């Protein structure tokens, strides 16, 4: 955005008496008019080199940004609050506001103040909103996370049957996808994509069935007029946006999908106003093509971020070895949407296997990939008029790296996925790449208005203008030397002032050489006579002066024209540029997963359509790396076999018992993560893995209160368990941890017992079920597909040692008291707990609390002091020393008898 001179603010339209309300100035009236059309956004109102905010916007922005709140004029007798941010730093402030959930309308001066003055002294410079900045429509580099997609999502719904669909777009890369959904899957499908903003029809926003989903999403939901989602008008809107006469080449879309696509495009047009980001054609996702993971499972497994919202500690962070922004985003996309087709999974695994077999070549590929900038985002910024020279430079660097990669791969026998990627790279616009290389300078400025980004020699007129601009002194000195030689006046000078501009000055005594002849008079034009000097100009000098004065402006004008020319060429090649960039991301992900597999000792999983789930020596990918960083004991690998026990049978259930801190939750999670890694196309942390495709993954591991919705921990647990039991099928994988622990013991045991029976008889799926209710191990005698396994421990000197090994069998104790002692509970509390436990285990309470209180007085803990640790006394030490000094083999019978009496005496003194 180029700075413009701020116009002088006109006087108020009317100045009434001191007791009457003061009318607003024309400028403030303009502000209020524009603000009225953007009530849901903070208005950045351009005034010279600042964006100003007024009234409530100023109060909100000053608090959010930590900037000074001041005032400007009055309205209805009250001061008008005002704050402002400099234009050159606007992106930094926008980033903070967007992060806090605000939307911003950017209002620019759309004419020069000089033009406004021509309409009258009270005229205000024309302004208009050129863009609405919202969380889902960002393109600026500073506002985006290079490793994360920035999706805008729209929900479409048809009248009558209420069918639903979702369309999501990342305008920073052009990605555009659409898929049908259902009310019960809606929240899960939204959270899988994890959009920054969700736009819905205002009628749907207030729908009682859907509103709970929108309440969970919160501020990210933006209601819009229902007309934007009209499926009947969608075809025309799509044709207009993509500038096509028919949608035959786009494939078939259902009515709700057309509604969602229409809503997404309409919102982009609304926020981008005059700009039209180039988008890929909408790609339809088919139901069942990806592994269904509900939001609770995504959260508990910490796939992309931890429960506390951090990326560090997540599975994505643990497996990410990518070196490009596009590769990082593709890896995240694959992790959050694993495949369910064994054939497609095998294609990805083949790519990783090839990279492992060609390590030298892959190291060279990764070196080239490190030089690949974020081409899709650079292209999008250029397309919407927010790009700069460095975005063109990013394309040039990307083309150069792509060329190097194509050379490295020349003649290589590649698997199908990588072969297709190489073909896309080879189709990049080589002519445009060469054009950029010729046109762009080596060092590029951030802003196009700074100039200097076109290479010397690319444009002859530009070179001339630059020479005049940068070398005016040398040019003037050369012309002065020519005039001295021509006139013979050695004291002749070419000077400059603000009145005459450039002029020739000679002493009065030497002026005759320039005035004595008609030829001289026509050559040297008299400008001014001084007391001791005369000043002249020439046609040549006047033209040079004009050129020098205009050279800087003309040079910048030429550069800006070249910039627009290159930008238009880039947009014209958008499809091939994006295809090449996507191909580079595929190579980045494949080589990164190969590096991960080699570094961490992962194996290639065998994935098919069976119900098998046999993991040998499996490890938790995140915990294992954390232990290595801490130089702690190595991770203990464990097997897990949930495969059918006979051909044609259903998957098995493992009932896992064992102590607290024994590793049950880690074991449960690691098997879920191994399934996800395998189906995203990655090698897995195991000795071997045979996995029948999982279509739905459910994990209920850990729970917390949902106070905002009035739900206790136990209620949250029951809701999540209900969702699992109602949705899991034979191809599902279910991970359940400690069901029923949030209520009374017998209630919890009953619920857990019934849930396991239901999983076995009704869902008939592969499942891991961890519990502290040891009574449940009896189910193995009743349920043929259920096996008991336990976390092994070793007891030593009243302590417990956790071996973290899974073994056949059942635990008979939870070792909770020992864990409490390890956690640092006061010794008196631990002792009291041990006594209570012994009484309960002995069955002496007969279920009556009063008898337990009688046997073990509760308040005695508070009255008794902790026993001091035994201290070694001097006499004890003397006795011990005497015993230690004895040499039994050297004593005579008489000496032995005397020694006994001596030791007895010492013992008596002690």
From Swiss-Prot:
CDD domains: ABC_MutS1. It comes from the Bacteria. ATP binds at residues 658-665. The keyword DNA-binding applies. SMART domains: MUTSac, MUTSd. SUPFAM superfamilies: DNA repair protein MutS, domain I, DNA repair protein MutS, domain II, DNA repair protein MutS, domain III, P-loop containing nucleoside triphosphate hydrolases. GO terms for molecular function: ATP binding; ATP-dependent DNA damage sensor activity; damaged DNA binding; mismatched DNA binding. Residues 1-21 are annotated as: Disordered. Keywords: ATP-binding, DNA damage, DNA repair, DNA-binding, Nucleotide-binding. This is DNA mismatch repair protein MutS. It comes from Brucella melitensis biotype 1 (strain ATCC 23456 / CCUG 17765 / NCTC 10094 / 16M). The lineage of its organism: Bacteria, Pseudomonadati, Pseudomonadota, Alphaproteobacteria, Hyphomicrobiales. The gene is mutS.
